[in-house]
Curated annotation (Swiss-Prot):
The gene is HAT1. The record marks W173 as: Interaction with histone H4 N-terminus. Component of the HAT-B complex composed of at least HAT1 and HAT2. The HAT-B complex binds to histone H4 tail. Residues 42-44, 193-195 are annotated as: Interaction with histone H4 N-terminus. It comes from the Eukaryota. Its main location: cytoplasm. It is found in: Cytoplasm; Nucleus. Residues 138-290 form the N-acetyltransferase domain. This is Histone acetyltransferase type B catalytic subunit. One of its GO terms (biological process) is DNA repair.
Length: 390
């Protein structure tokens, strides 16, 4: 019988071929990856297999990995080994292949000794429905956490664009990790890093090395797919910010290459924080807003400049300030000065208005999802008791 050599017969999307599962006592929760190019290449296409199915499963507590690759036919022996490509991204000698019974037996045994981190690492507790959750701040130098992270980190490749594995031997990395308090299931986690921040010659004193300041960075931020949409991301972000706001050595909170969904989460949480604490109640009514006030408030809130300006602009919009339009257009103009300088006046105004409308629509979209506690603002702001929909 002649072999069907049509490319479509032997080609499959790696996103479709890869099947992910988190398994517990009630069965498996199945889901698909968002990205597979870190494993199978930029095209996210696998060639050379007919009816290829790749199964990657994890115990929902220990994250012990299991791999099983199935296909009806392989074009030839020169075809790239899809199983090896996947195993290269998983902890070496830790994966159980094909033998599902052995995998279940192994993770069941591991669960007997699996424990949450020590109580002194606990930074936050919260409830959603009738479930209790806990957030810990831990170091990758902890052997148990290091192994758990080794097993989980492939999820960053599969769900965070441009993600890569971190250097787990660098002691500066910390992880904030969320668990279900009773079941011990890992809900999600974020990797963080702190960099020394140079504050200028006048502020620097080498004799006070213990007082040196740092910039704290959120690197990878992930809530496992089965647990998304329940508010865990918000709780995790708030816990991180709370820790760093209380840390006098941290002068600025940054985020590494945030995607659109994380930007939304960050905007909502940061806006809620400044509004619920009335942090911008003394915002000047002058235009442009005094740069000294901006610098002072940015430092108090530990926000990088771009993020602070976004929050300030959302605040002005929320307060229906007459300064909102001019303040935002001023920033847009300054940011795009070189691109605008060669345009005629009519085109320049059109471009500014288009950018203004686009940002205003985006700000309104974010504000519509913000939860604001009932609060009376200072009389100087001329506003009181405004509430936004949660």
């Amino acid at each position: 019988m002649a072999v069907d050599l049509r490319p479509e017969t032997w080609t499959v999307s790696s996103n479709e071929a890869l099947n992910l599962s988190l398994v517990d006592e009630n069965g498996a929760v199945n889901f698909k990856p968002t990205f597979t190019y870190p494993i199978y290449g930029d095209s996210e296409q696998i060639f050379g297999y007919k009816n290829l199915q790749i199964f990657l499963a994890f115990d929902s507590i220990t994250f012990k990995p299991f791999v099983n690759v199935k296909y009806d036919a392989k074009l030839n022996n020169e075809i790239e080994d899809v199983q090896k490509l996947l195993l290269d991204k998983l902890p070496e000698d830790d994966v159980i292949i094909k033998d599902e019974e052995a995998w279940i037996k192994t993770f069941t045994k591991e669960q007997e000794t699996f424990a949450l981190p020590e109580k002194d690492k606990l930074v936050e507790e919260y409830e959603i429905g009738d479930q209790e959750f806990v957030i810990y701040r831990v170091s990758l130098q902890d052997p148990a956490i290091k192994m758990l992270h080794k097993r989980m980190q492939i999820f960053t490749l599969l769900f965070i664009e441009s993600a890569s594995y971190i250097d787990e031997n660098d002691s500066s990395w910390e992880i904030f990790i969320v668990f279900n308090k009773n079941s011990k299931k890992c809900i999600g986690y974020t990797t963080t890093y702190q960099f020394w921040k140079y504050l200028g010659a006048q502020s620097f004193d080498s004799s006070k090395a213990d007082e040196q300041k740092c910039r704290a960075k959120i690197s990878q931020f992930l809530i496992m797919p089965p647990y998304q949409g329940h508010g865990h991301g918000k709780r995790l972000y708030q816990a991180i910010v709370k820790q760093w706001m209380n840390d006098l050595s941290v002068v600025e909170i940054t985020v590494e290459d945030p995607n659109e969904s994380f930007d939304d989460l960050r905007d909502r949480c940061d806006f809620e924080r400044v509004i619920n604490k009335n942090s911008l109640a003394d915002c000047p009514n002058e235009l442009p807003i005094n740069i000294d006030w901006i610098t002072k408030k940015q430092a108090q809130l530990k926000l990088e400049k771009r993020q602070f300006m976004r929050i300030l602009e959302m605040f002005l919009l929320y307060q229906k300030s007459p300064n909102y339009r001019l303040q935002l257009k001023k920033r847009i103009y300054e940011k795009n000065f070189e691109a605008l300088m060669d345009m005629d006046e009519s085109l320049k105004k059109d471009k500014l208005q288009t950018a203004f409308q686009s940002l205003t629509e985006d700000y309104n979209r974010i504000l519509s999802k913000v939860a604001i506690r009932k609060r009376t603002f200072s009389d100087s702001q001329g506003e009181s008791d405004k509430r936004l929909k949660a």
